[in-house]
A protein has these predicted regions:
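Glycine-rich flavin
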Residues: 42-50, 55-161
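Glycine-rich phosphate/pyrophosphate-binding beta-alpha loops
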Residues: 158-163, 243-247, 378-379
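Glycine-rich beta->alpha junctions and the first turn(s) of the following alpha-helix
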Residues: 202-292
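Short segments within alpha-helical structural elements
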Residues: 343-350, 386
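Glycine-rich phosphate/cofactor-binding loops in nucleotide/flavin-utilizing enzymes
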Residues: 352-399
Length: 399
């Protein structure tokens, strides 16, 4: 993809200001068309590129902003208030960049790639799903083939979010043909290294702009593109924490925009009858409290993660992230926020009424409702709850 070279990447405060402007001036303006046409939010992603937002997780010494998990969550939450699909693309991109930034620094290839990502503002996608694993991202069927410093990797993915629009794709696979399904590696496949053949469609209820059909991936490249750490460590220390936190942040952002629309409606009702409190003001206050609770939840978990200094260089911290306590914390965050977001949007709809139900109304909440319904399905809450149930059987003290 031909993208402009970005010379100077702003730091977090400037990135947050830019993201808020993009959410309002670009993402929100195109959100309805992105949703209706189930098309990639190209205008928003291009605006994020121009503002240097895509390299936010990259360390400052490599030219990035060095944003921590809480700061990345704030960026995703801000964008989600304009367009949920755009925010999901940004969140998934950040997850993959973080995997490289936190687990690839001992490799000269990945250090150079991160510098290039900062300069070119590359967009990264991932393929962690696979036909035959039934949604278990911690198991792979496909295996890496190596020889003469090169690799070959082919994979049948059930979903590949915005892969057709990405500059590179992070792909999970078995270490080799003799490895167990859970003995996985993560490989960075650049767009020029692969061919993608779409195998399914993407005509969904919500999150339509993520463009996530199934793909057949055929790729080859240098062994240097294989992350040096096993995927089990990458998942526990980075992919799971970043996924559940950034997703929760953007679900909050979608719900926040729904509450803002409800608040605008209630203020309009109040102006019609000066000196009186409209009956919709009370449920709005209750809804605001629910929204605040969700925000406090994801921000508190992000702050706790950042506070332990969980870098791949800190053995004690990384061991903590492999423990039952942190696993339960991530599971609780994901389930709680994914269930609360659509409930909050539903509450906003009850306040606004038919104007929220109509698609051509400035108070329309249909897209918000449909987008948040995806939250409990992307990594099924039932699967996560079953994992938590098993862990609670052996946990002596609640985290």
């Amino acid at each position: 993809m031909d993208v402009p070279t970005h010379q100077a990447v702003p730091q977090y405060p400037a990135l947050l200001d830019a993201t808020r402007r993009i959410a309002q001036d670009v993402a929100a303006q195109h959100a309805s068309d992105v949703d209706t046409q189930a098309r990639f939010p190209i205008e928003t992603i291009q605006a994020l590129r121009q503002a240097g937002v895509l390299s936010a997780p990259v360390a400052r010494e490599l030219g990035g902003a060095g944003c921590n998990l809480l700061e990345l969550g704030q960026l995703c939450a801000a964008l989600a208030q304009g367009c949920g699909s755009s925010a999901m693309v940004l969140a998934m991109h950040y997850i993959q960049v973080a995997c490289i930034a936190r687990h690839g620094l001992e490799s000269s290839f990945f250090r150079d790639y991160l510098r290039e990502l900062v300069a070119r503002q590359y967009l990264l996608a991932s393929i962690t799903s696979e036909v035959g694993t039934f949604g278990d991202t911690r198991a792979s069927i496909c295996a890496l083939e190596r020889g003469d410093g090169r690799f070959v990797l082919n994979k049948d993915a059930t979903t590949g979010s915005y892969c057709a629009h990405a500059d590179a794709i992070a792909v999970t696979c078995r270490r080799d043909a003799h490895a167990a399904g859970g003995d996985q590696l993560l490989v960075l496949v650049r767009r020029q290294d692969c061919t993608l053949t779409q195998t399914t469609s993407w005509d969904t209820l919500g999150m339509r702009g993520t463009c996530s059909p199934g793909f057949r991936l055929e790729s080859a490249g240098s062994e240097a593109q294989i992350l040096p750490h096993g995927f089990a460590d990458i998942a526990a220390q980075t992919m799971v924490p970043y996924s559940h936190t950034l997703w929760s942040a953007l679900w909050w952002g979608i719900a926040a925009d729904a509450v803002n629309r409800a608040a605008h409606y209630v203020r309009g009702e109040a102006r019609k009858h000066p000196g009186t409190v409209p009956p919709t003001a009370m449920p709005l206050a209750e809804l605001s409290a629910q929204l605040q609770a969700v925000r406090h939840h994801w921000q508190a978990v992000a702050q706790a993660f950042d506070a332990i200094g969980a870098s791949t260089q800190d053995g004690g911290a990384t061991q903590d992230l492999h423990g039952v306590g942190w696993a339960l914390r991530w599971n609780s965050l994901k389930i709680s926020c994914s269930e609360a977001a659509p409930q909050i949007v539903h509450g906003a709809l009850q306040i606004v009424g038919m104007l929220g139900y109509k698609n051509d109304s400035p108070f329309s909440l249909g897209r918000h409702y449909r987008d948040t319904l995806s939250a409990s399905l992307m990594v099924s809450n039932r699967r996560i709850a079953a994992q938590s149930a098993s862990m609670l059987l052996v946990l002596k003290d609640m985290p």
